[in-house]
Amino acid sequence: MSWKDVSVRSVAPRAGMAAPRLRYLRLVVVCLTSRASATRDCTLAEATDVHDGSLLWDLKNCSRVTLARRYLSQGDIAAFADALVGCAELCPTALELHTVPLDYEGSRLLGLALANGTALTSLSLTWNAVNVEGTRRLVEALGRNRTALTSLSLDSNGIGDAGGAAVARLIDGNSTVLRHASLAANFISDEGALALASALRDNTALVSVDLRHNRIGAVGLAALVEAVEAGGGSSLERLALEGNPDAGDAALLARLRAALDQRGGG
């Protein structure tokens, strides 16, 4: 027997029936399989009425865990983080949280779980309201230990320049093995771009960086181009800057394409 996807949805009462009073919803997230070596994608979506400490997480046999459009309390996040750290075999390698509100404490707990040793190589947090302080706490926790994380996405979290600078500190000097970093749609302007450009100069691991739909202007664009031309981000093949209205200098963009083309990117 196997459960590929686990979904929880709220159910409306029938006509004439009183709405149920849900005080606690205990969830057991389990992927069962008849083959010990097999893995499954596990999904929880659109769950409601979840309260502190009410989630039980069993992540064994889940290669990818996706949580979308739901509320997680700090107790839920703590239990989830503990499950990530405590997983001994056939553990998740990818975690995606989409439209799952995380405050700074939730971000810190996830970061600590990663720093304390998990099998995760990919972390995607999109539309989670991680914000500046949450980003700082997440990357500080990641920076304490060299994790296995190779892909990090913080798209659409409003992290701003301070959050961009926090990520820059994470990638500066190859303190991680990150190969893909995405910070799209985060209100990052020239200040954040300058910090990222400086970090790129000494980084040899990153292959792609996504800075689309931000507020980077001519100053930030020039700094990024100069960093790449100077040999920074020596493994970099893709630097996405579309959707930055003030970063449209054709000559600078042509220089960036030329520098990336020399590496086989673009």
Kindly give the residue locations of the regions a language model identified:
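Leucine-rich tandem repeat or coiled-coil scaffolds
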Residues: 2-266
